[in-house]
Amino acid sequence: MRIALCIEYDGASYHGWQSQKDVTSVQEELEKALMVVANEPIEVMCAGRTDAGVHGTGQVVHFDTNSVRKLPVWMVGVNANLPKNIAVRWVKEVNEDFHARFTATARRYRYIIFNNRQRPAIFSHGVSHYHETLDADLMHEAGQYLLGENDFTSFRAVRCQSRTPWRNLIHLKVTRHGDFIVIDIKANAFVHHMVRNITGSLIEVGRGKQKPEWVQWLLEAKDRKLAGATAKAEGLYLIDVDYPKEWDLPRVPLGPLFLPDN
């Protein structure tokens, strides 16, 4: 049988999603917890591999198992065996045509900046700190130049292994909530470091060093060296993954924390 899960995790303690030798990963911890409940080796596939320090509130995974368990048993049993900074949000049995990565039609991220002269003490690993005042409205205006299907070479990590830099950016919104600035971005898929590289360039606009139109120029230039620095990992969250409606997967608040879904 094939099971799909949605999980959330605080990525600050992990060297990313993917299992790696001699370091702790989210995948490793999840597979260990699943093996306790299944009483057999388990390998999971995820919708999007997050880097070291990146968080998730809506990561979707699937796994195959010969063990027959009721869905509440998977939910409670796996959560009981996970570290406190990883939790299962929902569980659903799916047929073998479902794949967490390849069935997905879009991914959605949020990047959270604590915009204050002083660094935060609480939630310090859950946000990125930027001390200069940022203009969220200008950042939002700049982000609109990236919408649609485009070549994102200027916002792609040098070592990105994707076969093509073309992605369809569906939604990008920048809003301010007191001292917090939230960059909400959705695309069919993302090249490596795309959200963090876009964020780094939007910060340049927000601090008044560049005009919003500069982002359009960057996109057309197709040169990573011209764009802003890669933003830190701490403020980034994978919050949602879209699938065709026929899969009827559960929906939960996107978060993180108090942030509204829209």
Swiss-Prot record:
Q: Does the keyword Isomerase apply?
A: yes
Q: Which GO terms describe its molecular function?
A: RNA binding; tRNA pseudouridine(38-40) synthase activity
Under Gene3D superfamilies, the record lists:
Pseudouridine synthase I, catalytic domain, C-terminal subdomain, Pseudouridine synthase I, catalytic domain, N-terminal subdomain
Q: Where is the active site?
A: D51
The record's section on SUPFAM superfamilies has:
Pseudouridine synthase
InterPro entries the record matches? PsdUridine_synth_cat_dom_sf, PsdUridine_synth_TruA, PsdUridine_synth_TruA_a/b_dom, PsdUridine_synth_TruA_C, TruA/RsuA/RluB/E/F_N
Kindly give the Pfam families that the UniProt entry links to this protein: PseudoU_synth_1 (PF01416)
> EC number(s) per UniProt?
5.4.99.12
Catalytic reactions on record: uridine(38/39/40) in tRNA = pseudouridine(38/39/40) in tRNA
| GO biological process terms held by the UniProt record | tRNA pseudouridine synthesis
Its keywords, alphabetically, are: Isomerase, tRNA processing
Chain positions recorded as substrate binding sites: Y109
Note the subunit structure.
Answer: Homodimer.
As for what it does, the entry says:
Formation of pseudouridine at positions 38, 39 and 40 in the anticodon stem and loop of transfer RNAs.
Which family would the database say this protein is a member of? Answer: Belongs to the tRNA pseudouridine synthase TruA family.
Protein name in the entry:
tRNA pseudouridine synthase A
Q: What is the lineage of its organism?
A: Bacteria, Pseudomonadati, Pseudomonadota, Gammaproteobacteria, Vibrionales
Gene this chain is encoded by? truA
